[in-house]
Amino acid sequence: MIQKVGLVALALVLGAGGGQAQTFEGSVALSYGNAPFLSTDDDEERLSERGYKASGYLGATFGDWRVFGDINVYNRSIGDQDFDQYAPGGASSFGLHAGRNFGNFYGGAFVGRNRFQGTDATTINDYVSGSLYGIEAEYSMGAISVFAQLGRAKMIGDTGDTEFTGKFSKVGIAATVDRFVISAEFEQGNSPLNFEDSGDEGDYRALGIAIDYQITDRVIGTLSYETMDIIANTEDSGSDEFFGIGIRIPLGATGAKRNNLTTSYRPGLAAAWAETLD
């Protein structure tokens, strides 16, 4: 059903724009660093492993209409450790976005999927997938942009036991200062009926801060920090962090434009953490 909605949205955009793309945009990015974590199931000891993040998006505009796809990968090296006893090895997302520009305002919708570790997989550290969809908007005021997403996700890691099924939302701001782009975003999600155990509620809250520096028209240096708190109940909780330094390569006519409306992988990561905390 979700895939059908996405295809319909894409068809509407192409039809409304006459099928002739006016501009193309995109970027690819890679950052490398540390991915610390803490779990109440591990005596609340803060541990750290190496990690990386990779992302990319590609889109086009058709008149006032816009369509783009994106992929985002977060990876933590956990070696031969079992994720349900140690920490998740990360999560990834890919999505399709479509909407319309109304002057400085963009409004649209998105559909996508997450890949994350779950015990329903064939082997203990293998991945399962789940779906998500929602609406999104962005408003630009010169050098400042504000953006938001509201969605729903269904991420089942262990059928009948651990999952994240519920709503999530994200708000953020990005400001351009000379060659710098400074951005911050906050995301939260709630799984009201099932999380760590069947019938138990669970939440996550995440904060991300990034600084981009435009070295040349086609090379951007990046610094980023993200932290995510996962709360199963008063006894079980965890935190997941990432410090990274990297590079982003803009593509297309829009050059250094930043894509703020990414498809979140955090509902899937929360479902993986639910299994770790169980």
What is each PLM-predicted segment?
Residues V28-N34, G69-N75, A109-R113, Y139, ...:
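Transmembrane beta-barrel strands of outer-membrane/channel proteins
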Residues F24-E25, F62-G69, F102-A109, A143-A148, ...:
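Repeated loop/turn-to-beta-strand initiation elements of outer-membrane beta-barrel proteins
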Residues Q20-Q81, W273-D278:
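Short glycine/proline- and aromatic-enriched beta-strand/turn motifs that initiate or cap beta-hairpins
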Residues M1-A21:
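Gram-negative bacterial Sec-dependent N-terminal signal peptides
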Residues Y32-E44, S48, N75-F83, N104, ...:
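Gram-negative outer-membrane beta-barrel proteins
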Residues R46-A54, N75-S77, P88-F94, N101, ...:
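Residues that define the transmembrane beta-barrel architecture of outer-membrane proteins
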Residues L58-F62, A98-F102, Y139-M141, I173-V177, ...:
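Residue-level signature of outer-membrane beta-barrel architecture
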Residues N194, Q214, R218-I220, M228, ...:
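Flexible, glycine-rich linker and terminal segments associated
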